[in-house]
Amino acid sequence: MLDVVDLSRLQFALTALYHFIFVPLTLGLSFILVIMETIYVATGKEVYKDMTKFWGKLFGINFALGVTTGIIMEFQFGTNWSYYSHYVGDIFGAPLAIEALLAFFLESTFVGLFFFGWDRLSKGKHLLATYCVAFGSNLSAMWILVANGWMQAPTGSEFNFETVRMEMTNFLDLWLNPVAQSKFLHTLSAGYVTGAFFVLAISSYFLLKGRDFEFAKRSFSVAATFGFIASISVLILGDESGYDIGKAQPVKLAAMEAEFETHPAPAPFLPVAIPNTAEMKNDFAIEIPYLGGVIATRSIDKEIIGLKDLQALNETRVRSGIRAYELFTQLRAEKKANGQVNEETKAQFNEVKKDLGFGLLLKRYTNNVVDATEEQIKQAARDTIPNVGPNFWAFRAMIAAGGLIALLTFGAFVQNLRNKVTQIPLLLKVLLWGLPLPWIAIECGWFLAEYGRQPWATYEILPVGVSASNLSTGDLWFSIGLICALYLAFIIVEMYLMFKYARLGPSALKTGKYYFEQSAK
């Protein structure tokens, strides 16, 4: 039966994955609009203005729903994860506050000028507004991913036993965290691919129907070029992000590669496996010798530490965490009784406080952490190993979808260069029906990032099990049902409007120049 923590996780997963349906398209379309309008201002060709306005209409529908779902998601830090907000809010809240005050206000202000300023602003000023929308969207993503990067690999912070909170010690370390920056660039390029693939798919639909040829062909050309470059960036930056995560979170690396044993370097790569987390082995696996180690460590002499060895290391850290928790409670008692603490006790605590989070893992099994049994200690260590199967297959689904996207954007780019886009209808059909591919890759990537971090809300600092609010299961089932109903309405509205305007094409602009307007005369 699902408890409060499980239901809180389920609700956050639903809202986060749903919200991220809209985010990558916003990121990608915003820069495609910049490219199209820049060409319009540079050449004066009206077709590029029409392209900017039409794709901007679809961007606007997506943007509105992305903002709405994002607000709902952020509220959960206060409603469902109140102890998390208390424990790490000083750090986690800072980039989110900057995002709201700087990036979100920038993009939301200029998005109004983008839509309503065509007849009120000069070409140059309107182009500047479009650039600000794109810049604001990307800046917003950066600060959100700085916050998420800290959850994955905490830097620039330390625990204060007096306030029982994590406190920021260096903002630059938080901001320039390598994990955060590589995640940001990888997510950004994935968004660019999503926007490009979206334009390619709908342009392919127009070309297959033989409608608005010039408009569709030019849209296809912009998207094919932008998408091909972005798809290469995704592969390169994805490798970099994976490398950084492998150094910061060896458990996640071992889980997504289903490495239960520590193999001599370089480790094999498993394209297919049936992981058995309970017995810490693969029931079936196909191995490609050496490839896994070369890809994951970029060397032939570095090991990928297996999950069995990582569990043993984590058991040692759980024991150290018990000592950290004991010293923490002692310091608190001394402070309360005497108004000051023993410096020797404080020095001892500082030596082991990095393992305090491992001690908190025991809260799932006992309120008296210091007197935890051997079985409870071993169970807490087992909890540090996430369920391998979902991580293993999510990673491979992401790679497979990303590889297909790269091949398709390459094909579109080559055909566009040859000026033979319409000569291979099969390519256009595959681009059209392959539209879900970017979302499959992105959602699998985010699932891997978050599920692979379990059992931690903030890696090796705060377990998920102690982060949740004091709610009832009834409260959570009600809110989950309400959110599902609301989000169902949102997706119906989104799909209706997207299909409506995508089918109309540039005729939706009512300029009198395009297919449905001409055929109605």
Swiss-Prot record:
The principal location of this protein is: membrane
* Cytoplasmic topological intervals: 1-22, 115-129, 208-219, 418-475
Question: What cofactors does this protein use?
Answer: heme
Sorted alphabetically, which keywords does the UniProt record give?
Answer: Cell inner membrane, Cell membrane, Electron transport, Heme, Iron, Membrane, Metal-binding, Oxidoreductase, Transmembrane, Transmembrane helix, Transport
Name a Pfam family for this protein: Cyt_bd_oxida_I
GO molecular function terms attached to this record: electron transfer activity; heme binding; metal ion binding; oxidoreductase activity, acting on diphenols and related substances as donors, oxygen as acceptor
Q: Name one GO biological process term.
A: aerobic electron transport chain
Regions that span the bilayer: 23-42, 95-114, 130-149, 188-207, 220-239, 398-417, 476-495
Checking InterPro entries in the record gives:
Cyt-d_ubiquinol_oxidase_su_1 (IPR002585)
Enzymatic class:
oxidoreductase
Q: What does this protein do?
A: Probable cytochrome oxidase subunit.
Assembly description: Heterodimer of subunits I and II.
Q: What else does the entry mention about this protein? A: Probable ortholog of the ancestor of E.coli AppC/CydA.
Name of the protein this chain belongs to: Probable cytochrome oxidase subunit 1
Species of provenance: Haemophilus influenzae (strain ATCC 51907 / DSM 11121 / KW20 / Rd)
